[in-house]
């Protein structure tokens, strides 16, 4: 993390996203934005009007404009492609997984793809099955991509800026439930390194790894459990690829217990991968089974009364950790 002037402000997650875009576009003329309806960014005053010539509104063809971004990256630009909703990743899998992720390997490093794909993960608000997925586990299985899931305003700004400067394709999964939550963000230059986890709360009894939007309920659960004498260490991986294994394993070796809260579906999830790593490399330290708190393997329903109970919650985390004691 770096900062120019030492000033800290409270701004929203949403503001931090576009502050990162603006700063990087002003810093580097190779940075361009591609996506649906994004010309509205300057018209609405979200970005400076002077940046309009580097903002390209595309037709509703995710595979098409992601391909445009890959081509732009090959010519030396640094495109940021806004997929709007994370579920639309499926429509662009060929460009993201088959092209962006592989070209550097297939050319022996002669070609680089400095591209960022932004995908907003929607839940709550009855967005239904076609708009509510969290497909980051699928992309974790695509060698050549970096995957980040920022949970705070400071990290969404710092990770987007670092992603734009990276020569490897990066997919940024933003949780829209965090958009209007505010937090401290350094003013000026601020970078969050990819592949470095953050310990949000120290603890001695249980390691709780919480991904993206699950951070909020994880910290609430840790506070509730502290009143019962249970000390929970909360870790935010921030990056899923590369994953900060030493931070997670070091915590598990101290606490002997691991719980993972992941808002994505259960099977073949980031939670599953973290659990497997701990079982392989820290089994000798474990005092209890590794537990996962995830969304079940079903399409997300439209009805709020059916949707809301699916995600990791404070109550679910507290219940699981109490049973480990």
Stretches with model-predicted labels:
Residues 1-173, 176-325:
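Thiamine diphosphate
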């Amino acid at each position: 993390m770096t900062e120019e002037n030492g000033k800290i402000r409270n701004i929203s997650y949403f503001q931090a996203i576009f502050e990162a875009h603006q700063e990087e576009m002003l810093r580097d003329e190779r940075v361009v934005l591609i996506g649906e309806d994004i010309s509205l960014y300057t018209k609405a005053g979200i970005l400076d009007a002077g940046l309009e010539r580097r903002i390209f509104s595309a037709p509703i063809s995710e595979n098409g404009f992601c391909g445009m971004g890959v081509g732009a990256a090959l010519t030396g630009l640094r495109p940021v492609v806004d997929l709007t909703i994370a579920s639309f990743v499926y429509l662009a899998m060929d460009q993201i997984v088959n092209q962006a992720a592989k070209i550097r390997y297939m050319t022996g490093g002669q070609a680089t793809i400095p591209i960022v794909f932004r995908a907003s993960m929607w839940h709550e608000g009855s967005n239904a099955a076609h708009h509510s997925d969290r497909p980051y586990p699928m992309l974790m299985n695509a060698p050549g991509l970096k995957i980040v899931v920022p949970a705070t305003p400071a990290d969404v700004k710092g990770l987007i800026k670092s992603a734009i400067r990276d020569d490897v394709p990066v997919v940024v999964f933003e949780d829209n439930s965090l958009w209007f939550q505010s937090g401290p963000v350094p003013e000026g230059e601020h970078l969050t390194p990819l592949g470095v986890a953050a310990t949000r709360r120290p603890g001695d009894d249980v390691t709780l790894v919480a991904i993206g939007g699950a951070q909020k309920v994880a910290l609430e659960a840790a506070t509730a459990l502290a009143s019962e004498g249970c000390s929970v260490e909360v870790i935010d991986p921030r990056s899923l690829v590369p994953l900060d294994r030493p931070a997670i394993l070091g915590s598990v070796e101290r606490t002997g217990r691991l719980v993972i809260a992941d808002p994505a579906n259960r099977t073949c999830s980031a939670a599953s991968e973290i659990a497997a790593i701990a079982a392989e490399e820290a089994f000798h330290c474990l005092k209890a089974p590794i537990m996962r708190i995830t969304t079940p393997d079903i399409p997300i329903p439209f009805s709020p009364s059916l949707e809301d109970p699916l995600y990791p919650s404070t109550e679910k985390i507290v219940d699981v950790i109490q049973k480990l004691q």
